[in-house]
Amino acid sequence: MKIALLGYGTVGRGVDQIIRDRVGSVEVARILELPDRLSDPRMTSDYSEIVSDPDIDLVVEC
């Protein structure tokens, strides 16, 4: 399952870490973040990139 996180503050980073460490069947594929904070290739500041991606199964607001 591929998910997208909306936000990458304290909660978003924690969710990403837990999924990487403990949930092998789930991948954080996209992350919505502010334009000046795009530090990871999974990140975008354009919400439409996430909602139009057919590979995203679940969107999580963090």
What is the predicted function of each stretch?
Residues 3-5, 61:
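Hydrophobic Val/Ile/Leu positions in short beta-strands of Rossmann-like dinucleotide-binding domains
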Residues 8:
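Glycine-rich Rossmann-fold phosphate-binding loop(s) that bind the pyrophosphate
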Residues 12-13:
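N-terminal Rossmann-fold NAD(P) dinucleotide-binding loop
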Residues 36, 48-62:
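Rossmann-like NAD(P)-binding element
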Residues 42-47:
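Short acidic-hydrophobic, aromatic-tinged amphipathic segments that line or gate anion-handling sites
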